Amino acid sequence: FDVPKSWAGQRVKIFFDGVMTDAEIMINGKPAGEMHQGGFYRFNYDITELLNLGKKNQLEVKVAKESANRSINAAERKADWWLFGGIYRPVWLEVLPQVHMEHFVLNADHQGKLQAAVDMAGDAKGHEIIVSVRSLKDGKTVYTSNGQTTITHPINNSDKEQMISGEWASIIPWSTENPNLYVAKLELKNPEGKIVQTRETRIGFRTVEFFPQDGVYLNGTKLVVKGINRHSFSVDGGRTTSAALSRMDALLIKEMNMNAIRSHYPPDEHFLDMCDSLGLVYMDELAG
């Protein structure tokens, strides 16, 4: 693969969305990092120092179908599942500034309150994170409870994790009958006032609560859970699925008058998007 000289001074990461199951990654004959174990979730390596700018670069991936980790092998290989191996989800590169948002988690409740936990890479002191929300349906900006279009979080320390909170007005909560969705945008502004990174994700404002001897509540209303178990599986692709297959499965489940799905492991992101769009609640059995 080609790496242009214009990438100089930036961080380059390679992402794997799913490799079954132990993976050793080499860039130009050198290890990208420790062997990755676990076949169902995304992982990445910072390969900046291994690249040859302005030249051809070589990626090698060595995959073992059986894991050297006994616990992982028991979870992935000893159950009554079809056994597959290889790179079965997308692989891509991301070019990032030296200081960037590495990972973030959003929690948006049905009253419009939003909390963001953002992991920073590099010393972000002096930067700002700007958060905004718009409707997925019509693209209209959603105003905060004090009438602003954004919330600005100044980073006054060198802590890796930055916590941001805000409240948005007049939101329509997500529910199984009305799966209303929004887009949250996080922008990173450097001390010179330039936006150096933008991240977006779809969100639903919802509150899920569990009460012993009572059940599950969604947005303060008891939810009668009617669901099924589902494997990520394609007749002609094995573990490699598609957005079209995800939509077909989600529609079939919805047509069966169900509102919930339990997976055996993290599914493809496009299936979670379909669940969000159609009003299906989702639970993972194994986080990895």
Predicted regions: what they are:
Residues I87, Y143-S145, I195-E200:
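Extracellular and select intracellular beta-sandwich modules with Ser/Thr-enriched
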Residues F1-H103, D123, R262, P267-E269, ...:
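Accessory beta-strand-rich segments of carbohydrate-active enzymes
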Residues E94, T150, R202-R206:
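Short beta-strand edge segments in extracellular beta-sheet folds
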Residues Y41-Y45, I151, S158-I164:
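Short strand-edge motifs at loop-to-beta-strand transitions and within beta-strands
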Residues I25-I27, K113-H153:
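Beta-strand-rich binding/interaction modules
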Residues L96-V99, F205-F211:
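Extracellular interdomain linker/stem segments of modular secreted and single-pass surface proteins
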Residues E60-K62, V183-E187:
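Extracellular recognition modules
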Residues M35, G39-N44, R70-I72, F84, ...:
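Active-site mouth of glycoside hydrolases
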